Amino acid sequence: IIIGSIYINFGGRYYECMSDCADLHSMFQRCRSIRVESGMFMIYDRPGYTGNQYFMKRGGYADYMGKAGMNNCVRSCRMIPSHSSTFRIRLYEHFDMGGEMMELTSDCPNLVMERFNVHDIFSCNVTDGNWLFYEHPNYRGRMYLIRPGEYKRFSEWGGRSARVGSIRRIMDY
């Protein structure tokens, strides 16, 4: 893939993608490499922007699939718009923006130790920028793309649980 452009399988037959694509299955069966020539993308191992999510920025990922613990299925990809001004996200301890609220404007490598003192984020509201939620502290584990808008429950961002250990702004590197 080539994203923004993204090339999937840049060592052989490839597919160039320059925007969101909800179903890449018809383009190829397997993906062994990815090259992002410009922009940033989130790739998914299921169609319709579902399943495991993987963040891609400019660069070549010749053996990314094995290193990231990802199978060789890339079934959808979403372009992440560049954002360079302020970042703002509100995190809530309950569904539907209920309970204690915490606002972030910068990265947080350990949500429990540094700021929120809870392990679970059940809902959030992004007013500025794009963010990545990570399942564990220090930007490890499953990741989830959080775009501007309201998320009334963790399942709306693709979360399997409300567990969020760290949060990072997606900046144009």
Segments from the language model and where they lie:
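Compact beta-sheet-dominated domain cores in extracellular/mature segments
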Residues: I1-Y173
